[in-house]
Amino acid sequence: MAKINFYAEGVSLPRIRRRIVGKWIAEVCSRYGKAVGEISYLFCDDEYILKANQEFLDHDYYTDIITFDSCEADTVNGDLLISLDTVRSNARALDLRYEDELHRVIIHGILHLCGLKDKSKKDEAQMRAAEEKALVMLRETIGSELSLLHT
């Protein structure tokens, strides 16, 4: 049974429209022949994600998302840590709405769980194209000016 959980550590939990997010994630997963199992999002600050990056991945830098893959066969399971600080600073640097960048990061982790990579230039280009397809799907569902966040 599909279950998507949202938690926060050191930040306020974004007011996620859970039903819409769940439907969107399920649609994206189904495009890759996958079903949603159990997914947990932990929204955090930069310091929390830096510590996790150091402890679990031996990386000494900030990042927007860390994805821990627990997938089984064709079922998507995983834990995703998202730094809202980095999402916000990336949105400013890219001149994007915060909500749009958060949507991209939310689905970026799901795409990793569906098997996409982003370590090489070719893989990164494929990831960006998949993100854009997923974001188009979202915009078609909720409208381009709307957000997955309650305002």
UniProtKB/Swiss-Prot annotation:
Residues binding Zn(2+): H108, H112, D118
Family that this chain belongs to: Belongs to the endoribonuclease YbeY family.
Presence of keyword Hydrolase: yes
EC number(s) given by UniProt: 3.1.-.-
Localization: Cytoplasm
GO molecular function: metalloendopeptidase activity; RNA endonuclease activity; zinc ion binding
Record's GO cellular component terms: cytoplasm
BP GO annotations: rRNA processing
Cofactor(s) it depends on: Zn(2+)
Cofactor binding notes: Binds 1 zinc ion.
The protein's name: Endoribonuclease YbeY
Organism: Porphyromonas gingivalis (strain ATCC BAA-308 / W83)
Function: Single strand-specific metallo-endoribonuclease involved in late-stage 70S ribosome quality control and in maturation of the 3' terminus of the 16S rRNA.
Keywords of this entry: Cytoplasm, Endonuclease, Hydrolase, Metal-binding, Nuclease, Ribosome biogenesis, rRNA processing, Zinc
The protein's enzyme class: hydrolase
